[in-house]
């Protein structure tokens, strides 16, 4: 079958930016029956890219891009997408690049749909969010399910509630799979630093755990949810309490990892105080009806919903005008490349 006719069988053309852990998992999903309507026309990591159909079809594409392929050129990738005969054209951003996120609005304005796991725009400065909303007026769509809860149905549920005239009043929960794992497992029987090293070795934290411990990733997720609920919150309006002591914030990663024991005494003290009151420690995000937002470590009673989480579970408790007696709770695994990639695929398929 001629290449042109073969391509016409596909409903959705995709360019994938980022072939790391999440992007690699997304590539694997493209080889499943669920992705039969998708046509990958370009893929790139931070340095190299591939747009040749035969190369893109190879199952070891991610590994090949580590050493082969043309130099990264987004103009070439977009040209490949524009040249496709597919009715729906999608850019998938599986990176954490702030620079790439800043281009989402530009791509939307050009008529491309964008599906992303990148929180830098939706959870960044407020002007960027407003630029994004303005770009959506052109008719292109923005799939961001993977930015919160590794694809748990948080944003989709919130949007449906708003479409039905409901409104978010308060929000509380555990929004980080890594911090959930750490405090679900921290019982004072061994140092926090030992648990942190274990979590890092298992891939539950970033290579530099300060990315998790700072609370900034949780703050981005809180902003994304709040903004989708109608709260025009700026980054500086979220109170973020970092778990990283001031002396450890500016040093390089190697030195930080060598000094993890400096986290032990402060957290052991907080744990002992909480235990004496019958409470446990959890790293919570909270938003109230007045738009006051806070992210940080708090004590909660043993019967609190967040005290009964397991592993890397995330939990989102939404109180709305209609769910006001008891909150609507969404809970499940909040970390992992496979579930995040599945959320990306789900958003792409919803565009077809």
Q: Can you annotate each of these PLM segments?
A:
Residues 2-110:
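N-terminal glycine-/serine-/threonine-rich beta1-alpha1-beta2 phosphate-ribose binding loop
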């Amino acid at each position: 079958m001629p290449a042109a006719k073969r391509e016409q069988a596909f409903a959705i053309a995709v360019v994938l930016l980022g072939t790391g852990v999440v992007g690699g998992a997304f590539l694997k999903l493209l080889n499943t029956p669920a992705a039969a309507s998708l046509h990958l026309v370009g893929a790139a990591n931070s340095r190299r890219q591939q747009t040749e159909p035969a190369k893109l079809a190879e199952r070891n594409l991610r590994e090949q891009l580590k050493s082969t392929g043309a130099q990264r050129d987004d103009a070439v990738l977009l040209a490949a997408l524009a040249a496709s005969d597919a009715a729906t054209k999608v850019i998938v951003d599986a990176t954490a690049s702030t620079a790439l996120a800043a281009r989402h609005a530009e791509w939307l304005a050009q008529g491309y749909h964008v599906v992303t796991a990148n929180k830098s725009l939706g959870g960044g400065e407020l002007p960027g969010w407003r630029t994004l909303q303005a770009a959506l007026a052109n008719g292109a769509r923005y799939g961001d399910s993977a930015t919160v809860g590794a694809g748990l149905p948080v944003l989709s549920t919130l949007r449906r509630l708003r479409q039905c005239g409901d409104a978010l009043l308060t929000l509380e929960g555990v929004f980080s799979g890594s911090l959930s794992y750490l405090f679900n497992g921290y019982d004072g029987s061994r140092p926090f630093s030992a648990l942190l090293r274990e979590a890092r070795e298992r891939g539950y934290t970033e290579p530099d755990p300060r990315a998790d411990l700072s609370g900034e990733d949780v703050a981005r997720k809180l902003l994304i949810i709040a903004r989708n609920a109608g709260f025009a919150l700026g980054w500086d309006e979220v109170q973020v309490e970092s778990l990283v002591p001031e002396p450890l914030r500016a040093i390089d990663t190697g030195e930080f990892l060598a000094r993890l024991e400096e986290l032990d005494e402060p957290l052991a003290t907080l744990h002992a105080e909480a235990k004496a009151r019958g409470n446990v420690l959890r790293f919570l995000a909270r938003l109230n009806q007045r738009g006051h937002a806070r992210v940080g470590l708090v004590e909660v009673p043993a019967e609190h919903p967040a005290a009964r989480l397991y592993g890397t579970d995330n939990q989102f408790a939404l109180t709305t005008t209609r769910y006001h007696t008891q909150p609507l709770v969404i809970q499940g695994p909040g970390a992992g490349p496979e579930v995040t990639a599945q959320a990306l695929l789900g958003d792409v398929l919803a565009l077809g």
